[in-house]
Structure formats: C-alpha cells, structure tokens
Amino acid sequence: FIEEMWGVKLKIIDLAVSTIPSSYLLPGILSAFTCQIPDVYFHSWQSDSLGAVARVLDGSVDLALVGNTFDEPDCCFIPFCKDKLVIATPVNQHYLQYQQKMDSGTLDFSDFLREPFIMRETGSGTKKEIDRYLEKRNIPASSLHIVARMNDLEAIRKSVAGGLGISILSACSAKDLADTHQILMFPLNHESAMRTFYIVYSKNRILKPHVKQFLKFVEHYYK
C-alpha cells in the first residue's frame, strides 16, 4: 500500500525487537540510519527476546534486536551494545537510607533480599540476566520476596515508582525515571551485572543488500 501510495519502490526491513531495544535503543538507531540512508522503510514488531528470535527463524522478519542469546544453530547473534543492571526502588525515606549506605560504601546486594521484588516474565532477556546474576552470587531465586510478576516493562516501572516494590532493570530503562526523581537507582557492582544486546539474523536466508547495510550499521553504532 505504501509503495503504491508513494509511487516508488521502497527498501523495506522487517524487524522483531524485544522490549528494551524497542523503547530505548531502536529509536536512536533508526533516526541515525535514515539520516544516512533515507530510502529505507521499517516494519517493527515488539515481543520478548524469545518471540523475536522465533520470528527470525520462521522468516517473518529480516532481523531481530534482542537482549539474550538462545541455543539456535540456525541463527547468528552479533553483540552490538552493553548495559548495566541496576536495582530500581521507590523514592521514600527507607530507600534514601539505602542511598546513604551506598554513598558510604557499606551497601550490599544482600541488603535488598528482604525487600518486595517485582520480576519480569520468563522469556525476557532481563529475566535471564537476573537469573544469571543471582546464580553467580549463589543466591537462590526462591529467597527473594516476590510480590508480582509482570510481562510489561512500563507496568514494572510505574509499579516501582508507585511504591509496590523494587525491581532489577537495565540502566537504560530506568535512567529517565531516576533523572526525574521518580525512582532511586542502585548499580549492581559485579562483573555479571552487565547485559548484552544482540542483532540476530538467520544463517539460512540471503540478506538483501540494504538489510546487510543496516546490520553492519547496528553492529558498529555504539562502538
């Protein structure tokens, strides 16, 4: 329809994008890419990381941007961006005391174990990175006081700001709320508290030249 309406043959790229790349990475990438290559049109679908990779495998999209890797021999996962995991908390006197402990260097992750946690759903890249972090610290997930599980990142952000509990988030998804003093943000100072985002393509498909061009652009965008 768009091709007929504009009367030109567009170069189309179909993307499947997981939650955090969709909201916090893709807008800047697309803006920068289309400044250089203006004759490309994008279709974007948002899902969790697992669902995005499934779309690559079934051929319904050209590429995926996700926050996790999977054991899929038919897919190639290329890292393009790293981000820190942080603990996001409500802004109140209780957590301001935690901030004082952090400033004095006496705060540890174990201090948060008794706090009410809001967790992401299985299938999300963030959830998998949280599981890895807990495993590295020898902390069983069952030891957390989980008060809610949600599959919507924005619902988690608002629930933290509203005082329901705390959550572990990617720093890029919490920064705007921290900057506007709606939440407090505590970095997880551990080597396993980093997460990587990947651009994914199928080894079984021949990528069109403009898709390859976008793939290379994303691969080097944050370097």
Residue positions per predicted region:
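Secondary-structure junction motif
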Residues: 96-99, 103-109, 115-138, 207-208, ...
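Short beta-strand->loop
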Residues: 76-86, 104, 145, 179-193
